[in-house]
Every structure is written in C-alpha cells, then in structure tokens.
Design a protein with these regions (language model features):
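Hydrophobic alpha-helical segments at protein termini of multi-pass membrane proteins
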Residues: 1-317
C-alpha cells in the first residue's frame, strides 16, 4: 500500500508539472517525444549516475573526514548539488545538438523536464524510506512535491536556459555561459539543501525557494513574450513580400490563431506550424554559421514554398 501510494504521489504531480511546462511553450511547442526522453533521463539515467558518482566522491572525502554527522552534512550540502547538477545537465549537452533546441524557452522546457524526472524518482525513494508514519509521509509528500522536486526542475531549467543562450555564441562566450549556468544551478541546489539541513534556516530555505520559483516563472513568461515578438518581426518581411496576408500578422502570435474563421480550417494547424517554424528559422539563421547556416537556409526555402502552396491550393478550391 505504501509503495503504491508513494508511486502515485511521486509520479502524478511531476508528470502534471511536465505537461504544464510543455503546454505553456505554446508558440513553438517541442516534440513531446523529445521532452519525455529528457524527463526519463532525469528519472533513470541521472539518478543512477548520481548515485554512483556520489558514492565515489563520498568515499574519497571520508578518507579525510571521519565524523559521521559532518560527512553527511557535506554530502548533502556540497556533494549532492555538484554531482547531481552534472548528471542532470550532461544530457542537455546532447539535446542541444537537436535543431529543435534553439532558444531560451526550449532550454527551460528540456532542462525542467530532466529536473522533474529526477525529482520524481527521488521523491518516490524518500516517500518509501522516510514515510514511516502517516503524518511523516504526508509531510514529506507536501514538502518534496512543492519544494524539493521543484528545486530540481528550476535548477536544471536554469542551466538549460544558459545552454540555449550559448548555442549561437562565439567560443569564449559559449564556455563562460555554460560554466555560469552550471554554477547558478548548483547554487540553487546547494542553497536549498543547506537551508533544510539546519532547523534555524529552514524557514529561510522555504522563502528562498518561493522567491526562486517566482523568478523562474517570470523568466519563462518573458521568454514566451519574446517568442511572440519574434514571430511578428520575422513574419513582417514575409507579409511585405506577399507570402502571407498582413491581416494574419497579429493573429499568428496570439491566441486568436487557435480560433476558427480567420483561415481555411482544413489548413489552419499546418499553416500555423509552418509560419511559426519559418519565423524561428529566420531568427536562427541570423545567429548561425557553417553547416547550421546552410541547414536553416534550406529549411527557410522549404517552408516558404510549403506555405505558398498551402495558401494557393486553398484559394483554388
């Protein structure tokens, strides 16, 4: 019964958070298959590697620190944030190679997915190991669902945002951005673990996490608003060149695009996806070089032709 309840308490909230983050990214929503892959890395891969490396690092530290309480505090406050942020963030270095990973919003979504997966598995383990009474179990479920697991989401999403920012930058800026992102993610993790390790700082820890979550939500919102502006700006030239109607500009970057009547319903979804992708490909082209530049140029030509044919076929009906 405990294991079943713990599984539900661990999986349902985290997967719900994942769906919310994925849904909020409404202008260029990431393929859910890829988001889920990152989530599962956090839930399985990152957990396994974190456990292995934490054991190795802790064994090394125990050579110098013999006192059990001090060693446990050090493992919680320093070793866990360092090792876990590396194992969670490492997968993003593979995800960023995807052409789907192209802006800060994407970094937040993919990084957040990994953090939520990690938090889900960690929650389950905590629920079954430390929920020895009903009151303890409920308390742990509430705290970890609202704070600890969300901390993993925010920390790795932060690293993902820095990673996305660095993607089209020159080498020096790229390296410094990635390193800074890792340090910020580790600081968030370390600050939370430190605060809940001592009774006198627990309240401060909750306040810190509330503040951090608010900043995370604001950053996510600003990134979404930025995408809205990119869509309008990049499609303005397409309207001037006659590819799309001017009247569509203010529709394509708003919720009105999900309503009926402004374009032939048989092509609405395909049209929205195509013009939105075109807008972001144009922005990516400006920041790219080498093989990536050639890829985006080809993609832009493809989507322009696709949109032209789509609208022409509708007019000829």
């Amino acid at each position: 019964m405990l294991i079943t309840a713990s599984a539900f308490a661990a999986v349902l909230p985290m997967f719900s958070y994942l769906l919310i983050i994925w849904w909020v990214d409404r202008y260029e929503r990431e393929p859910f298959r890829l988001v889920l892959k990152n989530y599962l890395w956090g839930a399985i891969g990152a957990i396994i590697f974190a456990a292995a490396w934490s054991s190795i690092v802790s064994a090394f530290i125990s050579i110098f620190i013999k006192e059990t309480t001090q060693l446990q505090k050090l493992e919680t406050i320093v070793v866990a944030p360092f090792v876990e942020e590396i194992t969670k963030g490492a997968f993003l270095l593979f995800t960023i190679r995807s052409n789907k990973f192209d802006n800060i919003t994407d970094g937040i979504v993919y990084g957040g997915a990994i953090g939520l997966g990690f938090g889900m598995t960690e929650n389950f383990l905590y629920f079954i190991l430390y929920g020895n009474t009903l009151v303890n179990w409920i308390t742990i479920v509430i705290i970890r669902t609202l704070f600890s697991a969300v901390m993993h989401c925010v920390a790795t999403a932060t690293f993902g945002a820095f990673l996305a920012y660095s993607k089209y930058k020159k080498t020096l800026v790229k390296i410094s951005s990635i390193f800074t992102g890792f340090l910020v993610a580790m600081f968030i993790h370390l600050a939370w673990n430190f605060s809940v390790s001592f009774e006198s700082t627990t309240l401060l820890g909750f306040l810190f996490m509330i503040f951090t979550i608010v900043i995370f939500m604001l950053t996510f919102s600003i990134s979404i608003i930025s995408e809205k502006k990119i869509i309008y700006k990049e499609l303005l030239g397409e309207a001037e060149n006659g590819l799309i109607p001017y009247t569509h500009l203010s529709i394509l970057n708003s919720s009105i695009r999900n309503k009926f009547g402004w374009v032939d319903e048989s092509i609405r979804k395909s049209y929205i996806n195509a013009v939105t992708t075109l807008a972001f490909r144009k922005r990516q082209l400006k920041n790219s070089s080498g093989n990536s530049k050639s890829y985006y140029e080809e993609d832009i030509n493809y989507y322009r032709n696709f949109i032209q044919n789509l609208l022409s076929n509708t007019e000829n009906k």
